[in-house]
Amino acid sequence: MSRFSGALQLTDLDDFITPSQECIKPVTIDKTKSKTGAKITVEADGYYEESESGKQKLQKVEITLQDCLACSGCITSAEGVLITQQSQEELLKVLRENQTLKASGDNEQVRTIVFTISVQPLLSLAHRYDLSLEEAGRHLAGYLQQLGADYVLCTKIADDLALLECRQEFVERFRNNAELSMLSSSCPGWVCYAEKTHGNFILPHIATTRSPQQIMGVLVKQLLAEKLGVSGSRIYHVTIMPCYDKKLEASREDFYSEVSSSRDVDCVITAIEVEQMLQAEEQTLQQFEPKDLHWPWTDQQPESMLWAHESTMSGGYAEHIFKYAAKELFNEDTPTELQFRALRNRDFSEICLEKEGKVLLKFAIANGFRNIQNLVQKLKRGKGPGYQFVEVMACPSGCINGGAQVRPTTGQHVRQLTQQLEELYKQLPRSNPDNTHTKQIYADFFDGTHTDKSAQLLHTSYHAVEKLNTALNIKW
């Protein structure tokens, strides 16, 4: 029996907001001068008419996914909007339709299906099915090709390009304005939070370099399309990522390509969704014939498709940029293994480059919203700790502990699982983004480094979301 009176009891108390009639976004109505006597008729099927001297059908009010992304009404639960557009069900539907078109010989309508796999969800699936990372990658490639994939790619080339662009952006910013802290941009949960909560104050701090997912989208829809001799709109590009926020990122208007007349990434699924797809078929990853991942970018393939970037599990931005900046800006060499010093908790750490008692560089890694909020508040108060660069990730422990990674199956604590995934990650060979593959991509596709084309396709912009001052967002 409830110990609260009926008048005081609250129900459905949670922070998850799904699309419904309770959407708080006010609809803009274009008003025109009307004469007396106009009449609006609403029929049983929802048809609207305005009659005066004749009839005119009124426009239907629509709230789109883009409205939800551009609305300040909710932050943490916009993923609910994407249930139909960014789901395993939609993916399987597209794959079935494509197989039917192939069988009918309707080649003009057949789409080239491309999957891109990020290393973090692959680690999660490798642990789940007790496989090495290489084995998991090859079995997953076999599974996806059986579903209908034409190409199964890794994110290595995009990871490398993101590091190269971000480090150059930092050096340029440092030389122009050393006082402005630069914050990483690869985490869409963090970017969405910054746009909706802190707006124009924090956005100038965020790097403009696109995330590896969106760089991969450009390469698939433009470079791969060019190599295949097809339009980018005839490619259906799916990414497998460690968190649901990547679905939001793929849906941003900034990542709709006028060149290909399509989104750079059409669908995002996650490690946990891959597990659910396998469970629905009562199968495991090991049951599928192993296949090699594809490498369509350069004539010579890399030694391995799966690499680690520095020692951090979220792309290695802070460590790589620190090493590069130390050499480029101050001609200082750094150790191969950098030692970040943990501060109040293991999710906030820093490193300094000092010479003759003077701090030349001060970088940090901030994972989890508690640390992000503390960092932003210090910047707002003008009491920032003097970091020139901060690698920011919304999830505690970073991308390896993304919200859509496979859950522990034996009552294991998430922290213990994360540590095991970190150990798997450390077994991977280290990637140096300065390699023959990135140099060839820059030369052949981007017309060189630091060009207008590379700036357009490898960078993006951010948009402060205006706060909605409306009583519609108050629920009593």
UniProtKB/Swiss-Prot annotation:
It holds the Pfam family Fe_hyd_SSU. [4Fe-4S] cluster 2 binds at residues 187, 243, 395, 399. Keywords: 4Fe-4S, Iron, Iron-sulfur, Metal-binding. GO terms for molecular function: 4 iron, 4 sulfur cluster binding; metal ion binding. Gene3D superfamilies: 3.40.50.1780, Fe-only Hydrogenase (Larger Subunit), Chain L, domain 3 (3.40.950.10). [4Fe-4S] cluster 1 binds at residues 23, 68, 71, 74. Component of the cytosolic iron-sulfur (Fe/S) protein assembly machinery. Required for maturation of extramitochondrial Fe/S proteins. Belongs to the NARF family. This is Probable cytosolic Fe-S cluster assembly factor GH10760. The lineage of its organism: Eukaryota, Metazoa, Ecdysozoa, Arthropoda, Hexapoda.
